[in-house]
From Swiss-Prot:
Function: As part of a SNARE complex may be involved in endoplasmic reticulum membranes fusion and be required for the maintenance of endoplasmic reticulum organization. Also plays a role in apoptosis. It is for instance required for endoplasmic reticulum stress-induced apoptosis. As a substrate of RNF185 interacting with SQSTM1, might also be involved in mitochondrial autophagy.
Species annotation: Rattus norvegicus
Lumenal side: 221-228
Modification after translation (UniProt): Polyubiquitinated. 'Lys-63'-linked polyubiquitination by RNF185 increases the interaction with the autophagy receptor SQSTM1. Undergoes 'Lys-29'- and 'Lys-63'-linked polyubiquitination by RNF186 that may regulate BNIP1 localization to the mitochondrion.
Protein name: Vesicle transport protein SEC20
Protein's membrane topology: Single-pass type IV membrane protein
Compartment annotation: Endoplasmic reticulum membrane; Mitochondrion membrane
Family the entry assigns: Belongs to the SEC20 family.
CDD domains named in the record: SNARE_SEC20
Record key words, sorted: Apoptosis, Coiled coil, Endoplasmic reticulum, ER-Golgi transport, Membrane, Mitochondrion, Protein transport, Transmembrane, Transmembrane helix, Transport, Ubl conjugation
GO MF terms, alphabetically ordered: calcium-induced calcium release activity; SNAP receptor activity
Domain of life (superkingdom): Eukaryota
Subunit structure: Component of a SNARE complex consisting of STX18, USE1L, BNIP1/SEC20L and SEC22B. Interacts directly with STX18, RINT1/TIP20L and NAPA. Interacts with ZW10 through RINT1. Interacts with BCL2. Interacts with RNF186. Interacts with RNF185. Interacts with SQSTM1; increased by 'Lys-63'-linked polyubiquitination of BNIP1.
Length: 228
């Protein structure tokens, strides 16, 4: 059965290897990082945490080495501790180089964006001028349409007034026509009545004349032919 001290040494070595691999992976992420700075800052924070954990485990391993009873095992563990420290220093050097590479890439990217920003600024200025000109043209067109609609409205009002006047004239003419129709109808009635009266007068005259002639004939008859 393994001694507790040997188990602790084994765990320390496993943790040291794990943290070393995690640090290397984060350093590679920093090399590949192209920004922004906030992402680089976040990666560096993670690297610092891993270095702290790695350093703590190396110190634990070193303490365990010093507590070994056998000198040979002690020297072997101290050699492992020294190798881990060298590897940690190498990782720190790689970390600094990766930061320099990343910051240089971010600076170059920012310069390129500034240059593109100048072109973009000129393009936006040109676009604004074009939009302003287009807006002015549209405004003039809308004003022209507004004037045209105003003229059409005025013409419509004049046409409406003319229509109202014509309607009033037609109504007046209709009233006059109704009045004339009444007058004509009254005249027709009077003429009909007059014609009837004239016929009656003629008939009376004819009857009076016939009566007169009959009377004359009767008198002549009595004078000339008394025996009849």
């Amino acid at each position: 059965m393994a001694a507790p001290q040997d188990v602790h040494v084994r765990i320390c070595n496993q943790e040291i290897v794990k943290f070393d691999l995690e640090v290397k992976a984060l350093i590679q992420d920093i090399r590949d990082c192209s920004g922004p700075l906030s992402e680089l800052t976040e990666l560096n924070t993670k690297v610092k945490e891993k270095f702290q954990q790695l350093k703590h485990r190396i110190q634990e391993l070193e303490q365990s080495a010093k507590e070994q009873d056998k000198e040979s095992e002690k020297q072997l563990l101290l050699q492992e501790v020294e190798n881990h420290k060298k590897q940690m220093l190498s990782n720190q050097t790689s970390w600094r180089k990766a930061n320099l590479t990343c910051k240089l890439a971010i600076d170059n990217l920012e310069k390129a964006e500034l240059l593109q920003g100048g072109d973009s600024l000129r393009q936006r200025k040109t676009t604004k001028e074009s939009l302003a000109q287009t807006s002015s043209t549209i405004t003039e067109s809308l004003m022209g349409i507004s004037r045209m609609m105003s003229q059409q409205v005025q013409q419509s009002e004049e046409a409406m007034q003319t229509l109202v006047s014509s309607s009033r004239t037609l109504l007046d003419a209709n009233e006059e026509f109704k009045s004339m129709s009444g007058t004509i109808q009254l005249g027709r009635k009077l003429i009909t009545k007059y014609n009837r009266r004239e016929l009656t007068d003629k008939l009376l005259i004819f009857l009076a004349l016939a009566l007169f002639l009959a009377t004359v004939l009767y008198i002549v008859k009595k004078r000339l032919f008394p025996f009849l």
